[in-house]
């Protein structure tokens, strides 16, 4: 693995998973890169593995139940800084459509779900919008 790559568990197709070196995720403006500390396998990950996810395209890095440490921030991190322990909210929404304005981001007209529409967190790093981060209390291991 070089400085520009990371390890990720890639679902190539139903029932076929490979541990691969993949490029580090880009960190666009308004995003943070998070180094994974822990992930949880969700029922939707199992459905994807079995080929029962209608929304997922292959290959895909699964995983949307994530906890990690901020490794890089592009832009104003607001209350977040490099080194903060965070949990990651899985829905990436536009913030502007009718559903988003009613705080129903899961119904966003442009909804992207980590590990379904975009690369997830069963990898060393994931890149997510800063607004999708939730700070983990420092007292929590």
Language-model segment annotations:
Residues 5, 17, 31-33:
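Intrinsic-disorder/low-complexity, polar/charged segments enriched in Ser/Thr/Lys/Arg/Asp/Glu/Gln
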Residues 3-9:
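Short structural boundary motif marking the start of a folded domain
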Residues 25-39, 52-98, 132-139:
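Glycine-rich beta-strand-centered segment in the early N-terminal region that forms part
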Residues 44-50:
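Cytochrome P450 core scaffold surrounding the K-helix E-X-X-R motif
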Residues 15-19, 43-44:
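Short N-terminal binding/cap micro-motifs at the start of the first secondary-structure element
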Residues 12, 24, 57-63, 114-118, ...:
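Short Gly/Pro-enriched turn/cap motifs at secondary-structure boundaries
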Residues 94-141:
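NAD(P)H dinucleotide-binding glycine-rich loop of Rossmann-like/cofactor-binding domains
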């Amino acid at each position: 693995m070089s400085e520009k790559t990371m390890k990720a568990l890639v679902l190539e197709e139903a029932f076929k998973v490979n541990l691969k070196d993949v490029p580090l995720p880009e960190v666009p403006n308004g995003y943070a890169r998070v180094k994974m500390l822990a992930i949880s396998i969700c029922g939707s990950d199992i459905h994807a593995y079995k080929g029962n996810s209608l929304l997922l395209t292959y290959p895909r890095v699964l995983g949307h139940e994530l906890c990690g440490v901020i490794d890089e921030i592009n832009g104003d991190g607001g209350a977040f800084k490099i080194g903060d322990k965070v949990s990651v909210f899985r829905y990436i929404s536009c913030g502007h459509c009718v559903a988003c304005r009613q705080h129903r981001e899961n119904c966003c007209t442009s909804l992207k779900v980590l590990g379904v529409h975009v690369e997830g967190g069963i990898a060393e790093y994931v890149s997510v919008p800063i607004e999708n981060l939730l700070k983990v209390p420092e007292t929590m291991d």
